[in-house]
Amino acid sequence: MRLFHEAKNKIRRRGVSTQQVVESLHTNASAALELPILHVETVALCVVKYTTPPAAALELKDLISTAASELWKPSSVFKSGSSVVTLDTEDRQCSEYNLSKDYLTCHPEDPLRRAGSAIDNVMRSVMNDYRAKYVMHAIESSYTVLLKYDVGGHFVSHYDAARSAPRAVSVTCFLNDDYVGGELYFEHLNITVKPSPGLIIVFPSDYPYRHLVTPIEQGTRYSIVKWYSYV
């Protein structure tokens, strides 16, 4: 009972009702959320798409959008090649939640705990495959960031590596597609990736792989991003 009340209080602070907490604890207690890799496609040098079940991705989106409803904050960004973190909405306009910081301390049936575990599992499989193809050295990631782009949300052309963030590999997982806009465009490769639930794209973090997110015209775009650095 004590664990139930701890979970209830923690999740209610996120704007989730007691009924939703009860449903989470009883309905989802033994339900592991899995995103197995169904298909792998190389679309350009070192740019690889991984397809996972759309239904599982949509369930993950529902977990995140509910459980993190009170936790979103304006997204910050490193200026490319610098050590400066900025909240400049002219460059990037979206909300984020760093799931890595606390989901492992959540109650086992907390929706964010389930989401974090599912993300870790699929990313481990994806990166094992990608590293076998392209990366010689060991890599690791300590960040799992949830992103929410509302109408008008965007991210100008950029690359992910910076002096104080020496990233080697970038990963984006799309959770839904019921919105207009929000495409991922690689400027130098002239490749547009149209989001679909469960699609994961992996690519190097440096300059040749500059990319942008086109403005959201309608709806809300949910995604997960991770960055990996050499150990």
Model regions: which residues?
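Structured loops at beta-to-helix junctions and adjacent beta-edge loops in soluble globular domains
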Residues: 50-53, 149, 174, 206, ...
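Charged, surface-exposed interaction regions in soluble eukaryotic proteins
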Residues: 133-134, 156-159
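Membrane-proximal basic amphipathic "stem/tether" segments
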Residues: 1-23
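Non-heme Fe(II)/2-oxoglutarate
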Residues: 16-134
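A short coil-to-beta-strand element that immediately follows conserved catalytic motifs
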Residues: 133-144
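Conserved, well-structured core segments
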Residues: 49, 145, 169, 173
